[in-house]
Amino acid sequence: MGHKVNPIGLRLGVNRTWDSRWYAGQDYARLLHEDLKLRAFLRRKLSGAGVSRVVIERPAKKPRVTIYAARPGVVIGKKGQDIDALRKELSRMAKTDVALNIVEIRKPEIDATLVAENIAQQLERRVAFRRAMKRAIQSAMRLGAQGIRITCGGRLGGAEIARAEKYREGRVPLHTLRADIDYGTATAKTTYGTCGVKVWIFKGEILAHDPLAQDRRAAEQAPQR
C-alpha cells in the first residue's frame, strides 16, 4: 500500500496539510477550478523561479496565495515591479483582490519537486540520465536528507524500448506515517518522447501529530517577503 499510494496524500492530517485551504458549500466546483487555473498560470509564468508549491487560502475577506520558490528574486523583479504585475493578474483572474506572499526555499536540493524538475530539464538537454540521477542523490544527501529514491521512466537515452531506472540511497520508509517524506514528479519532453521522473526524499521523523509541520519548517528557514 505504502509503495503504491501518493506519500503526500497518505500523510494528510498527520504531518502534512492541504495546499488549498478553504471551505465552500455550493461554490466548491467553481473555487476548485479557480485554484487549478491560478496554479497552472503561476507555474507557466514563473517557470524560471523554481516554484515548488502554491498554497491558496480563502479567508472571509480576500484569497491569499503563498508561493514557495527557490529564486524569489525572479518573482519579485526589479523594485517589486514583477510581483505587483503578478498580483494584478491574479486579482483579474480571481475577480477579487488577492494577497500574495513569497517564501524562499533555502535548500532546493532537498525539495522533491525541484529535484524532479531539475532532472527533467537535464534529460531535455540530453545529459546522461544516470549522471543526472546520481548527481541529484549526492547533492540531497550532502545537504541533510536521510534518504532519497529516484525513478526515471521512458525511452531513456533514446532506447527503442521504454524502461524504468531506479536509484536509491539511505532510508525511505514509505509505510511509516510519522516519516517526513517529500514527493515530487516532473515530465521531460525529449525528442524521443516523454520521460517521467519521480522523487521521494526522506527528511526525518515528525513524532508529534502536527499537520502544519512542513509549513512551519519552511517558514523557519526563510522569512516571508
Curated annotation (Swiss-Prot):
It holds the Pfam family KH_2. Gene3D superfamilies: 3.30.300.20, Ribosomal protein S3, C-terminal domain. Residues 38-106 form the KH type-2 domain. The keyword Cell membrane does not apply. PROSITE patterns: KH_TYPE_2 (PS50823), RIBOSOMAL_S3 (PS00548). One of its GO terms (molecular function) is structural constituent of ribosome. GO terms for biological process: translation. InterPro entries: KH_dom, KH_dom-like_a/b, KH_dom_type_2, KH_sf_prok-type, Ribosomal_S3_C_sf, Ribosomal_uS3_bac-typ, Ribosomal_uS3_C, Ribosomal_uS3_CS. The keyword Ribonucleoprotein applies. PANTHER family: 30S/40S RIBOSOMAL PROTEIN S3 (PTHR11760), SMALL RIBOSOMAL SUBUNIT PROTEIN US3C (PTHR11760:SF19). Belongs to the universal ribosomal protein uS3 family. NCBIfam families: rpsC_bact (TIGR01009). Binds the lower part of the 30S subunit head. Binds mRNA in the 70S ribosome, positioning it for translation. This is Small ribosomal subunit protein uS3.
